[in-house]
């Protein structure tokens, strides 16, 4: 999976963004479960998924704040 930039994230629609947020939260849950059962091979996915989730949540919060202040 290629690294997304903030510019790519800002181009997503609200529905796409919420879908990606939901998918990343599920992926993080699965990664934690695999790590606990010692089946996880790609530990770098934790950092990548958390970073991507943080970017999505930041842009989502920016949008919601700009909608309420306008």
Curated annotation (Swiss-Prot):
Keywords: Ribonucleoprotein, Ribosomal protein. Pfam families: Ribosomal_L29 (PF00831). The keyword Nucleotide-binding does not apply. InterPro entries: Ribosomal_protein_uL29, Ribosomal_uL29, Ribosomal_uL29_sf. GO terms for biological process: translation. One of its GO terms (molecular function) is structural constituent of ribosome. GO terms for cellular component: cytosolic large ribosomal subunit. Belongs to the universal ribosomal protein uL29 family. This is Large ribosomal subunit protein uL29. It comes from Prochlorococcus marinus (strain NATL1A).
């Amino acid at each position: 999976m290629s690294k997304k930039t903030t510019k790519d994230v800002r181009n997503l629609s609200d529905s796409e963004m919420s879908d990606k947020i939901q998918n990343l939260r599920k992926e993080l849950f699965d990664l934690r479960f695999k790590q606990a059962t010692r089946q996880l091979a790609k530990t770098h996915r934790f950092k990548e998924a958390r970073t991507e989730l943080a970017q999505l949540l930041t842009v989502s919060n920016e949008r919601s704040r700009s909608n309420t202040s306008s």
